[in-house]
Regions:
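A structural signal for short loop-to-beta-strand junctions that line the ligand-binding cleft
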Residues: 78, 86-90, 117-157, 189, ...
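Glycine-centered hinge/linker elements that transmit conformational signals in sensory
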Residues: 177-180, 220-252, 293-297
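Conserved C-terminal helix/tail region of periplasmic/extracytoplasmic solute-binding proteins
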Residues: 61, 159, 383-446
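Extracytoplasmic "Venus flytrap"/periplasmic binding protein-like
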Residues: 31-32, 52-124, 159-166, 259-261, ...
Length: 446
């Protein structure tokens, strides 16, 4: 009898212990997805906020892989081209959509969007929807944040140097300002311009300079123009400006290096993505919050020269987790997520540039007062169908929408980098680039 009582008591303890364990051990996520992202500040914020605000509610665990821009592009291309299926969600932009839509490399989102009215497609800027849709008019990627390009500068340093930056500057005015604001004694470069090789690194800003100088990669009938006078003049100006007044080790500086330099007070001016405000105006990251001025992308022969881009999420064609992938994408690209970032991290950090609603938000408008008009104006003015002074063979401001452009742009950027370091002249670099461009053009000439 005593043994029986002891057995019952022990059993009761075991059952209670198991029950307690079940209550205290976190439940395993119902599903897991793998997401590949570029290592920009907005994505790092997303990684930080996901577990507590998405996984907790959805039960979907998100495994992030974050890479520098050039490495990301290579990794995404390899994964979707081979159908490896290592990632469910990949980070791409308008260039990739133009080349991959309808190929099976990435999935159409139309049915998912139609079944998810809370995502509110109508709130997304038409330029973002159009840029992330294929020729079949189907949407292939959801924009996380959108951007154009603009000039950013330290107001206090400009005042100290006796410089006035116009709201709509020319590149000649920018060069003159960089000369006056360059302060090597105090470790401050007059300007930062991307020199890191890569079609989406160095040649993102540089192609906009080419455009406004009157140049183009190709004419409408596919005549290569890489060593034409306007192209050479633009690249010569860019390289000369960097060599005289630019950041140290220019060929190692991409977006990340320039944004860090600007935030840490090592750079007086910077021409780059409008989305950089999420970093340089972010309390805790930037040492100079509230000290920046903003102007439209500098011009020479065109009325505007800002680019148009979106970092966006797409579902890899080989993914077997389409539903869970969309749940994550829908949440991350929603106005609800923008509000979450605004409340948790500050409105300057919100991934803007894609939804009309955030530009009507009073708290956002208050925080973004210094750059609100320039950013919104730049996004509205950007015209991928007419970015220069002549007709083009494809749409795109800072890229040519053909698969070969990624390799072409990167190869030419490597030659330009050699010119930046004095290993060859700009003309020599672009003569080499012309030969490469002619090979691409030959595939498309009729």
């Amino acid at each position: 009898m005593k043994n029986r009582k002891r057995l019952v008591a022990v059993s009761t303890v075991v059952i209670a212990s198991l029950a307690f364990t079940a209550l205290t051990v976190p439940a395993k996520a119902a599903s897991e997805i793998n997401v590949l992202m570029v290592g920009n500040p907005q994505m790092k914020d997303l990684q930080t906020l996901t577990a507590e605000n998405f996984t907790k509610d959805s039960g979907i665990k998100v495994n992030f892989t974050i890479l520098p821009e050039n490495e990301l592009r290579d990794k995404v291309t390899l994964d979707v081209s081979t159908g490896a299926g290592q990632y469910d969600v990949v980070t791409i932009g308008m260039y990739e959509v133009a080349n991959w839509a309808g190929t099976g490399k990435i999935k159409s989102l139309d049915s998912l969007v139609a079944a998810d009215p809370s995502w509110n497609k109508a709130d997304i800027f038409p330029s973002m929807i159009n840029g992330l849709s294929g020729t079949d008019k189907k949407l292939y990627a959801a924009p996380f944040y959108g951007e154009s390009s603009m000039l950013m500068y330290r107001k206090d340093l400009a005042k100290k140097a006796g410089v006035t930056i116009p709201l709509r500057p020319t590149w000649a005015q920018v060069a003159a300002a960089a000369a006056k604001m360059n302060d090597k004694k105090n470790g401050i470069a007059g300007i930062c311009l991307r020199g890191l090789p890569g079609w989406g690194e160095q040649f993102a800003p540089l192609t906009t300079v080419v455009n406004t100088y009157g140049g183009t990669w190709f004419t409408k009938d596919w005549q290569a123009q890489v060593n034409s006078k306007p192209f050479v003049d633009a690249v010569s100006f860019y390289v000369d400006l960097v060599k005289k007044y630019g950041q140290p080790a220019p060929t190692q500086a991409g977006f990340t290096e320039c944004v860090n330099g600007m935030a840490q007070g090592k750079i007086a001016m910077w021409y780059d993505a409008t989305s950089a405000t999420a970093s340089i105006e972010k309390v805790g990251f930037s040492k100079h919050v509230g000290q920046f001025g903003y102007a439209y992308a500098p011009v020479v022969k065109t009325k505007q020269s800002g680019w148009l881009w979106a970092w966006a999420f797409a579902i890899a064609g080989a993914s077997k987790k389409e539903s869970d992938a969309w749940k994550f994408m829908s949440w991350a690209t929603s106005s609800k997520y923008e509000n979450l970032v605004g409340e948790k991290l500050g409105w300057a950090a919100a991934p803007d540039g894609k939804r009309a609603s955030i530009y009507a938000n009073a708290e956002y408008k208050k925080t973004a007062a210094a750059y609100y008009d320039v950013v919104l104006g730049s996004l509205k003015a950007a015209n991928p169908l007419n970015p220069g002074v002549q007709p083009r063979p494809t749409s795109g401001i800072q890229f040519v929408a053909v698969p070969e452009f990624a390799d072409l742009g990167t190869a030419v950027s490597q030659e330009v980098a050699k010119a930046m370091t004095g290993k060859q002249t700009v003309k020599q670099a672009l003569d080499k680039g012309q030969k490469l461009a002619e090979k691409v053009a030959a595939k498309y000439k009729k």
